[in-house]
């Protein structure tokens, strides 16, 4: 996994996941999956606080809750582009940050994911915020590994 500052208000994160592209895309567009990994370590995103309408103009809303003190962090975005299973683009209403997630089939059961954030607010560019974002990618990798293991078990039963 890597991340870089591509410009003064732009961040790029990349990660390779051991899961097929269709599954990785599905997990990013369905609340019952997002609830397992959305947000950094130490937060949760209850499924009842996640709304996903994956179509251009559709909403993407989440509420992350700090597990230690119960603080809530709502986010509302609108999808600009939805191209299954290749790309998701949304713009956050409050900050104006645009997020482009590109899913690349690397063959077999490997998927490359690039997350490009543009017009990134100052607080999101902090080292602490970037470290938190990386922990959410770690949580996503763990969730995908558990899903893939479950699917392999079911297919051999």
Where are these regions (language model features)?
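Hydrophobic ligand-binding cavity/cleft-lining segments
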Residues: 1-44
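Short beta-edge strand/loop motif at the mouth of beta-sheet-based domains
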Residues: 12-13, 32-72, 152-157
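Short, hydrophobic/aromatic-rich segments at coil-to-beta transitions
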Residues: 55-61, 83-90
